[in-house]
Amino acid sequence: MARPPPPDTPARRRKQAAHARGLAAEDRAAAVLEAQSFRILARRLRTSAGELDLVARRDDLLVFCEVKLRRSLAEAAESLQLRQRRRIIAAAELFLADHPELAPLAMRFDAILLGRDGGAEHLEGAFELEG
């Protein structure tokens, strides 16, 4: 027997709106990478260590990209904390364990910062493995 749908509450609507904004932000970030000749290999990849927003490749370079949407680019830049960087690195290691053919590629951790005003900034090498 199927469960009835959850009630439509303000909290549920906020969560749905946040999810939709996140998807739209990742689409914008993917477009930034694709404009630089990257091919998107994965989006919103969940691992036991955490989620990878975007995994992209261009030639012999593999990029794990975190997408941050905030009111301003400055707020987006401040939102990438050490603990989150460590989770991203751990998730990237799990991704590479599942895709050993990609392990020989050069690897970089980027961030794409998006402001709600439409601004975008691609931070290449936003953080390192030492995290």
From Swiss-Prot:
Belongs to the UPF0102 family. It comes from the Bacteria. It comes from Azorhizobium caulinodans (strain ATCC 43989 / DSM 5975 / JCM 20966 / LMG 6465 / NBRC 14845 / NCIMB 13405 / ORS 571). Transmembrane segments: none annotated. SUPFAM superfamilies: Restriction endonuclease-like. GO terms for molecular function: nucleic acid binding. Pfam families: UPF0102. InterPro entries: Restrct_endonuc-II-like, tRNA_endonuc-like_dom_sf, UPF0102_YraN-like. This is UPF0102 protein AZC_4471.
